[in-house]
Amino acid sequence: MEQEQDTPWTQSTEHINIQKRGNGKQTQKLEHPNLTQLMDHCLRIMSQVDMHKQIVSWKQWLSLKSPTQESLKTRVLKRWKSFNKQEWTS
C-alpha cells in the first residue's frame, strides 16, 4: 500500500487502536490526538478559499473601465491593502 502524504486528516484517522477483550473479540477505538490540528487545517483552508473569492471579485470589479470609478478604485485599493496587512498579522 502506498504511503499517503501526512496531513492532519490522515494523522487523525490512522490512530485506530485495535484491542482484544478477554473473550477474544476485537474492539476498535478511534482516538483523535490531532483533532485540534485537523480543525485548524480546515479553518485555514476555508479562510484561504474565502480570501481567494474576495480577491477574484475585487479584481473583476477593479477591471471595470468606467472613468468615473477611478477615485473609487484608489480608495478601494487603499482599503484592500490595509485589510490585507491586518489579515497577515493576525
Swiss-Prot record:
Feature type site, description High pathogenicity: 66
Keywords: Apoptosis, Host cytoplasm, Host membrane, Host mitochondrion, Host mitochondrion inner membrane, Host nucleus, Host-virus interaction, Inhibition of host innate immune response by virus, Inhibition of host MAVS by virus, Inhibition of host RLR pathway by virus, Membrane, Modulation of host cell apoptosis by virus, Viral immunoevasion
Name of one Pfam family that matches: PB1-F2
UniProt key word Membrane: yes
Any GO CC annotation of this UniProt entry: host cell nucleus
Note: Is not encoded in all strains, and seems to be dispensable for replication.
Name under which the protein is recorded: Protein PB1-F2
Originating species: Influenza A virus (strain A/Seal/Massachusetts/1/1980 H7N7)
